[in-house]
């Protein structure tokens, strides 16, 4: 799945959860970033606010700029004046970005409930599990397996920091988010 499709799936899942939250009377805010914050809606409440959230979500686009988690999550944290559920849609591309993200997340989880949404990387899983037919297939499988292990290490560290993590297929991203949101509400964690 190309990066643009991943962004579209994440935005669709965010809109689905925003709709459910607004219908339930909760406040919702949309915040998007890459190297710097790009889209922010401010906090809104009520079903009538969904059109504005949709309009702001339409401004979210793919960017080739490297994600700056430190700047974005620090900026977001400064805007939040009460304990909030912060949902972060992301994929980990390299260990350095992941390490910087982990440093910032640790500070964010001290005050907020943080939920990471990630799409399963079916392509990597397929490469890692594919029986080799040629020598280069072995190298691809080993590399894919290493990347998947690195991803699991980061997920484990996020959980140790107190963040919740959902890894779902692209088809289940929205429903999985709504299910977890409703579960967190039912458990009175919000």
What are these regions (language model features)?
Residues 4-190:
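Exposed, interaction-prone extracellular/peripheral surfaces
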């Amino acid at each position: 799945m190309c990066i643009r499709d991943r962004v579209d799936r994440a935005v669709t899942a965010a809109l689905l959860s925003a709709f459910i939250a607004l219908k339930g009377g909760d406040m919702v805010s949309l915040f998007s970033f890459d190297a710097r914050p790009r889209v922010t809606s401010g906090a809104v409440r009520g079903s009538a606010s969904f059109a504005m959230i949709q309009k702001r979500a339409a401004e979210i686009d793919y960017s080739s700029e490297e994600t700056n988690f430190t700047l974005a999550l620090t900026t977001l944290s400064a805007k939040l004046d009460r304990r909030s559920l912060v949902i972060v849609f992301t994929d980990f591309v390299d260990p350095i970005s992941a390490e910087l993200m982990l440093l910032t997340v640790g500070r964010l989880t001290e005050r907020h409930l943080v939920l990471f949404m990630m799409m399963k990387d079916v392509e990597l899983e397929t490469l890692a599990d594919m029986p080799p037919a040629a020598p280069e297939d072995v190298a691809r499988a080993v590399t894919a397996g290493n990347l998947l292990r690195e991803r699991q290490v980061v997920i484990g560290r996020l959980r140790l920091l107190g963040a919740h993590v959902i890894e779902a297929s692209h088809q289940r991203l929205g429903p999985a988010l709504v299910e977890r949101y409703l579960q967190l509400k039912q458990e009175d964690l919000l």
